[in-house]
């Protein structure tokens, strides 16, 4: 529901990012980047008591990071894949498999954690807000522009060059940041709603159990 609200708000403010209904300037994604790199090619040894989280493709859903089945690694394993350490505000793009092309922003709680095998994009924050670009890619732009790139090989796959050449709307940073604030507020509302529903369900189950007892 709330992701649909974000999509609708994006289209209202900035137009259709596929057909560019507002006639904005368009530049390749690389013009907004400071760095783009691949994650590790060798899986680390996992440890459920490890100090660090290891974000895989399966942890990236609907433009967000999910904790479901999150694996962990030790400090020793983390040291072997230092290039995968996250500073926060990167965008992770799944590079192969069923979820190829799915994206997320590395939010504050995942700073100093580790990305898995996927593409890690660091934007120039002086001109680009990662929340804005993540939401842009999670409009119907995902199905119209990104997903078709991933099916050109036998197995779904996207590479760094394809990501760098994605066409992106040019939007003033202030407008990007205002929209990003709206997205964060929507995410917070969604979290609070899910928490309230969870508490309500727990209360209902407790009442039923007490009555049956």
Residues of each region from the PLM?
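Non-catalytic DNA-recognition/assembly elements of restriction-modification systems
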Residues: 1-39, 165, 170-178, 184-210
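Low-complexity, Lys/Gly-biased intrinsically disordered segments
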Residues: 22-63, 77-81, 100
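Short, ligand-facing micro-motifs at secondary-structure edges
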Residues: 40, 61-72, 91-115, 131-135, ...
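A structural connector/turn signal
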Residues: 76, 80-81, 108, 153
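Short, well-ordered loop/turn sites that connect or cap secondary structure elements
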Residues: 86-87
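A short glycine-rich beta-alpha junction/loop motif
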Residues: 96, 111-119, 128-131, 150-177
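Short loop segments at secondary-structure junctions
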Residues: 109, 123-126, 140-141
């Amino acid at each position: 529901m709330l992701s649909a609200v974000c999509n609708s708000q994006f289209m209202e403010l900035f137009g259709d990012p596929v057909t560019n209904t507002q006639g904005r300037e368009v530049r390749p994604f690389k013009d907004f980047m400071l760095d783009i790199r691949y994650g590790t090619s060798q899986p680390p040894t996992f440890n459920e008591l490890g100090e660090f989280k290891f974000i895989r493709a399966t942890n990236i859903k609907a433009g967000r990071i999910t904790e479901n089945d999150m694996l962990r690694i030790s400090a020793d394993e983390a040291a072997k894949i230092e290039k995968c350490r996250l500073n926060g505000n990167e965008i992770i793009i799944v590079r192969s498999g069923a979820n190829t092309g799915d994206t997320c922003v590395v939010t504050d709680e995942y700073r100093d954690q580790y990305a898995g095998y996927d593409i890690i994009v660091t934007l120039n924050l002086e001109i680009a807000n990662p929340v804005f670009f993540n939401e842009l890619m999670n409009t119907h732009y995902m199905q119209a522009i990104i997903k078709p790139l991933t099916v050109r090989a036998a197995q779904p796959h996207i590479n760094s060059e394809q990501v760098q050449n994605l066409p992106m709307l040019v939007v003033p940073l202030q407008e990007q940041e205002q929209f990003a604030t709206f997205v964060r507020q929507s995410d917070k509302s969604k979290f609070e709603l899910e928490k309230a529903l969870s508490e309500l369900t727990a209360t209902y189950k407790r009442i039923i159990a007490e009555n049956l007892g």
